[in-house]
């Protein structure tokens, strides 16, 4: 690791001791500096942690944006005197974006807590979206019933017609029995079931995130044209609000479709492919126009649009870090009443989350679509989220 800019002439890092050392002839000049920038290839976590903790107290700004292959900050005690931390443009796996966005104080606390104790994080967010009355809540109930009782949970009558989701309903779910997972790797999902009425759409962005998986639910009984229209409407919304999210399209009411199922499935899959192609072409045309203008603001906007163009972006570590909405696989058809397709859907969701592939789940593999899965988090972070989950579960049970 080296120090770039003028600091390289004043500061030396003795890698054999992993400590910062001052040259006697430059010691006074170093004391007058407040900004330090580290650059080069990211060292092993233990080495980087030692470097971070050894930064002299008079420095106020730490710039790590020049370090390549940096995917995580190690557990460490950042100097209390630092008031600014500049990171690479590629989002880190640790701390997560929700911590980084709150600034240096939150990052310092997170790394300190991580140093004092951590455990692997096997929880992910599942967003269930779609038109009202498409069967989103019944689908969530059916998947949870299958996880607990298997095929004996069906037939299932579903929710009453007047039992509609108001705003968003949140519930925790372990999709597979504990014995189906490797020791210590029980995948758990926090399910956000979003109300589909138009009046709730404006508030969805408050609870949505682009590092989650979205189930886009469509009602197959509406016919090909209406099913495709509703799906495109929600794909556009997801592209706007969560451009990096992974989307799986699920068709409900399979038992009510009769012989039209095959035609509907083919129509939906063709519409998805056409939607992805059209959105990419539209955004690329806009990008070219903005870049051709030469205006600074337009160039910045072009850079933002490139991130949403729909092309998957991969960082130096081979992990997916951005891009537009990623529709994985083809339409999956289920019946919440008979249970047909529910078990396959649950296993499909787990496979995609755990491996990024539509194959049998193996949680010991390295996930690409959800790279934070299995990474260590502080015990304090896990304890807080577990307490919140317990409170939500208790509230749901009381309401039931």
Predicted segments with their positions:
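Short, flexible boundary segments at extreme N-termini or domain junctions of P-loop NTPases and their
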Residues: 80-127, 131, 180-181
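Noncatalytic alpha-helical scaffolds and linker/capping helices
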Residues: 340-400
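A structural signal for leucine-rich repeat
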Residues: 2-30, 47-56, 73-80, 96-103
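Conserved Switch II/interswitch segment of TRAFAC-class P-loop GTPases
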Residues: 211-232, 242, 254-261
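Conserved G1/Walker A P-loop phosphate-binding module
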Residues: 112-160, 187
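Canonical P-loop GTPase G-domain recognition
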Residues: 98, 102, 108, 256-363
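Concave beta-strand-loop units of leucine-rich repeat
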Residues: 1-6, 12-18, 35-43, 64-69, ...
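Switch I (effector-binding) loop of TRAFAC-class P-loop GTPase G-domains
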Residues: 146-184, 198-200
